Regions:
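Loop-helix junctions at membrane interfaces
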Residues: 1-167
Length: 167
């Protein structure tokens, strides 16, 4: 039991680091923020780890990316949105890319696009301006989905879930 908790914690920390890198370092500035593929790694974490670990990895990795990339105003919204994103996926399925997790992409997209639209509308006091960010959020969720599907298929091919036994 203790070994499994340590393994989960280490995997969550590794995911937080990867999420940070693919959010903070490999991003494209758009509108009032930036777009990135870090969400694809949040999706993967949520398919491999129980919710609290995946939520922490997403919130910490993406939140720190905002703090250290000059977008600290986005930190509170990011922490909430990314933690909730982990709820959209299941770590209990035998495979990463399965019907359940493919269906989870839809609410994950809605959370990202809708969550950041609402957050930007609140912090700017102008929902008209917030509408301008939606195309960037769409690019973000679609590119993150491509990363998730490619890596998920590859990891399923080497049976990573049965090898790690994180659930």
């Amino acid at each position: 039991m203790k070994h499994q908790q340590i393994l989960r914690l280490c995997c969550a920390a590794a995911f937080a680091a990867v999420i940070y890198v693919f959010t903070a370092i490999f991003h494209i500035p758009v509108h009032t923020g930036y777009t990135h593929v870090g969400d694809g790694f949040i999706y993967l974490a949520a398919c491999l780890l129980p919710w609290p670990y995946a939520a922490a990895a997403g919130a910490i990795g993406a939140g720190l990316a905002d703090l250290f990339s000059g977008y600290a105003i986005w930190f509170p919204g990011t922490v909430i949105i990314k933690a909730l994103t982990a709820l959209c996926f299941s770590h209990q399925a035998e495979r990463i890319v399965c019907v359940r997790n493919l269906a989870g992409l839809i609410p994950a997209w809605a959370l990202c696009i809708g969550g950041y639209f609402m957050y930007e509308g609140i912090i700017t006091g102008n929902f008209g301006v917030a509408l301008l960010g939606i195309p960037g959020y769409i690019v973000q969720v679609l590119s993150s989905t491509a990363v998730f599907l490619a890596l998920g298929k590859a990891l399923d091919g080497i049976r990573i879930k049965s090898r790690l036994q994180l659930h």
